[in-house]
Amino acid sequence: MVKLSSIIKARKANALAKKNDKIKKKDTDKGIRQKHSKKEGKDETLKRDVEKFIQNVNSEDTPSEDDSMSMDAFLEGGFEELDSANSNDAGSSRKRKNLPNENTQDSTSESSEEEEDGLESYQKQLEGLKEKDPEFYKFLEQNDQDLLEFNAAETDAMAKEIDENERLKSSSGKIVLTSDTIQQWQKLLETNHSLTTLQKVVQAFKAAAFLNEEEAEDLKYTISDSKVFNDLLLLAIQYVPKVLNYHVPIQEDAKGKKFINTDSKVLPKLRPVLKSYGFSILRLLEGMTDAKNISLLLREAQNVLPYMITYRKFLKQFTQATVEVWSSTRDDSVRFSAVVLLRTLCLTADITLLEFVLKEVYLGMARQSAYTTVHTLDKINFLKNSAVNLFLLDAESCYLIGFRYIRQLAITLRNTIHQPSKDSRKPVQSWSYVHSLDFWARLLSQAAWLSREKGVASELQSLVYPLVQIALGVIMSSPSSQLFPMRFHIIRSLIYLSRHTGVFIPLAPSLFEVLDSSYVSRKAKASTLKPLDFDVELRASSSYLRTKVYQDGLIDQLLELLSEYYVLYATDISFPELVIPAIVRSKRFAKRSKNAKLNRGLLTLVNRLEQQSKFMTEKRNQQKFAPIDSDSVEQFAQTIDWQQTPLGIYVVTQRQTREEQRKLIRESVQQDQEHKEQMRQKKKQALKSDDIELDDLSEEEAEDIDE
């Protein structure tokens, strides 16, 4: 049997090579040293030792005593004793082993033709080994097939793989993610629900969230491709909740509240992953600008909220970020996704966290409503309606927060009344204050409707009286004719509240104060100003005062609100007595007024009130119960359809007409704002461009820009 010491030492060299981190090799073209993988060092070392062994076989050296070891003894491990007994041979073997490495480093500058000759020589030596020592060749076939199949194609593939690995390493030593890696992770998450893969995905997700930031310097992964970035986001957002739900399922109680089993043995292992994943979502939510990605992130994030319930710091920051998106975004899909997420958070949170969420929702709505225009009005209405739905998820928390903030509104009004000044009036005479009153009016109205549907009394009903007193106090503290638009907004809110709660609110005196104002009764001056849009105006500018445009707008608003107010009680059994003061006062005013439009509108309204009074008197005369019978009185009102009454028909027709007029006014205002925006953009382009000068603008355009 031929000598095998070189093969033995080669195997030991392979074991030592696994402990080495990098093997230095001189670059063929540039003469610099490159880092190679352990696999290359292992295969190259083994290849050189086998070549030397084949050369020894071909030279037909005489075997020594120790070389007469059989192949069976070699496989049984007896070579260890033989190897320890022949330390001299081992030392010489180590010398022989180091020699090829030195030769390899010195020969890195050889041409590709010499490498091809070496490969051909290597193949010939393997053929010679097969003929002279078939037993050992068979052993290599069974245990090291890759060594026998080592050829030029494999060399190129290995080099390509090394280059790929080196390319995947950034200059800082981080792992550069690829699409193949993302696909492999996705398969593992789908099939095995691997927690190890989950941890890797969360680490990579954190790298994506903090990309190009200081926090990303200490992270393991890095991303250099936008497609990989998007694929990673989809993977982390969609599959992480699925894997979490597989190991720790989400449960739901009868009230719809979602929770998880906190006694799960897997949950403690997932806590670092959950914390990292949560703050990564938070960072993405704060930095994203694409509406589709934000909407997707919000939709999928609600699936991990039950796992995050113990992370108070994260939940508070996440709530604030979500409320900011909900209140400030212009995209409807993002807004709806944010509402769904906040609703899930309210259903998952305990009483303390729920109060925090509702408080942030209310403050976010109040902040955004401070700037009301024709463009933001629809969004503000959506914010108020969605906030009402969130508050009514828990009546107890809703009452506590409602009591607190309604009291705050009362304190602000009290300070204005006791210390009247320009600065003290600003908080009350603001859009935030008016929209807050309207929000609580909507909430209490919706709560009253729900209590009637369920047949259970609501504790929120007790907040109606203080809210009405605050609203009437704001009207009384703001008698200025410039603030008539604000008065109309508050009266609309109170009419809405009265309609849904059934509470009688005396609003006629506040409306007739406008009728008695000199801005309505006296003759106004002509003006070319555009009609004032009362829906988006809180205060009329001084240029509108005593103008025909402003007077006509006040008359339209006054007639509308008078009809809307009295139609609330159109089916009430006491309607004939209720409208007597209004009829008398309107007729008296029409006699001394010279405003034809106002007189015509007032007399038409008076005519409808008289017809409705006659209609209700006839209906009332047909009944046999006494006014003290409250149940019969309530049933009497429910048997009459208000839309089929004389006053009801008039109000429905007027609503349709006014809606068309409002639509035209809003379109006109919107076109005007768009025109101004175009002028501003044109001015910016003119300033940036060297070819366009401001002198090219027309005088009309220049005036628009100045305005």
From Swiss-Prot:
<dbReference type="GO" id="GO:0005654">
    <property type="term" value="C:nucleoplasm"/>
</dbReference>
<dbReference type="GO" id="GO:0030690">
    <property type="term" value="C:Noc1p-Noc2p complex"/>
</dbReference>
<keyword id="KW-0175">Coiled coil</keyword>
<protein>
    <recommendedName>
        <fullName>Uncharacterized NOC2 family protein C1142.04</fullName>
    </recommendedName>
</protein>
<feature type="region of interest" description="Disordered">
    <location>
        <begin position="667"/>
        <end position="707"/>
    </location>
</feature>
<feature type="compositionally biased region" description="Basic and acidic residues">
    <location>
        <begin position="18"/>
        <end position="32"/>
    </location>
</feature>
<feature type="region of interest" description="Disordered">
    <location>
        <begin position="15"/>
        <end position="122"/>
    </location>
</feature>
<dbReference type="Pfam" id="PF03715">
    <property type="entry name" value="Noc2"/>
</dbReference>
<dbReference type="GO" id="GO:0030691">
    <property type="term" value="C:Noc2p-Noc3p complex"/>
</dbReference>
<dbReference type="InterPro" id="IPR005343">
    <property type="entry name" value="Noc2"/>
</dbReference>
<dbReference type="GO" id="GO:0005730">
    <property type="term" value="C:nucleolus"/>
</dbReference>
<keyword id="KW-0539">Nucleus</keyword>
<comment type="similarity">
    <text>Belongs to the NOC2 family.</text>
</comment>
<keyword id="KW-0597">Phosphoprotein</keyword>
<feature type="coiled-coil region">
    <location>
        <begin position="659"/>
        <end position="700"/>
    </location>
</feature>
<feature type="compositionally biased region" description="Basic and acidic residues">
    <location>
        <begin position="40"/>
        <end position="52"/>
    </location>
</feature>
<feature type="modified residue" description="Phosphoserine">
    <location>
        <position position="112"/>
    </location>
</feature>
<feature type="compositionally biased region" description="Acidic residues">
    <location>
        <begin position="692"/>
        <end position="707"/>
    </location>
</feature>
<dbReference type="GO" id="GO:0042273">
    <property type="term" value="P:ribosomal large subunit biogenesis"/>
</dbReference>
